[in-house]
Amino acid sequence: TALFLAMHYTSDIATAFSSVAHICRDVNYGWLIRNMHANGASFLFICIYLHIGRGLYYGSYLYKETWNIGVILLLLTMM
């Protein structure tokens, strides 16, 4: 869905809001693509947080190198 949204989105500060309105109003099923993208991203982060919780529960934080790599990947995902 991100590729379809990127085809119509402009990141310029003056036109960003109007490009989102254009996606929702003028693109065929643009509102659906935007909602699917938002829900998919939310589901991805829920899965990531569950994975972190699983690691905490099973004591994986004791493996320092693995845990630090996971934290770096989490921060990169959030950027």
From Swiss-Prot:
Q: Enumerate the transmembrane spans.
A: 1-7, 31-52, 67-79
Q: Where does heme b b566 bind?
A: 51
Q: From what superkingdom does this record's organism come?
A: Eukaryota
Carries keyword ATP-binding?
no
Q: What UniProt keywords apply to this chain's record, in alphabetical order?
A: Electron transport, Heme, Iron, Membrane, Metal-binding, Mitochondrion, Mitochondrion inner membrane, Respiratory chain, Transmembrane, Transmembrane helix, Transport, Ubiquinone
Database matches in Pfam families:
Cytochrome_B
Cofactor(s) demanded: heme b
Q: Does the keyword Electron transport apply?
A: yes
Q: Coiled-coil regions in this chain?
A: none
SUPFAM superfamilies on file: Transmembrane di-heme cytochromes (SSF81342)
Listed binding positions for heme b b562 are 37
Where does the protein end up?
Answer: Mitochondrion inner membrane
How does this chain sit within the bilayer?
Answer: Multi-pass membrane protein
One GO term under biological process is:
mitochondrial electron transport, ubiquinol to cytochrome c
What GO CC annotations are associated with the protein?
A: mitochondrial inner membrane
Give the cofactor note.
Answer: Binds 2 heme b groups non-covalently.
Recorded GO MF terms: metal ion binding; ubiquinol-cytochrome-c reductase activity
Quaternary form?
Answer: The cytochrome bc1 complex contains 3 respiratory subunits (MT-CYB, CYC1 and UQCRFS1), 2 core proteins (UQCRC1 and UQCRC2) and probably 6 low-molecular weight proteins.
Its family remark reads: Belongs to the cytochrome b family.
What does the record's miscellaneous section state? Heme 1 (or BL or b562) is low-potential and absorbs at about 562 nm, and heme 2 (or BH or b566) is high-potential and absorbs at about 566 nm.
What the protein does comes down to: Component of the ubiquinol-cytochrome c reductase complex (complex III or cytochrome b-c1 complex) that is part of the mitochondrial respiratory chain. The b-c1 complex mediates electron transfer from ubiquinol to cytochrome c. Contributes to the generation of a proton gradient across the mitochondrial membrane that is then used for ATP synthesis.
Name of the protein: Cytochrome b
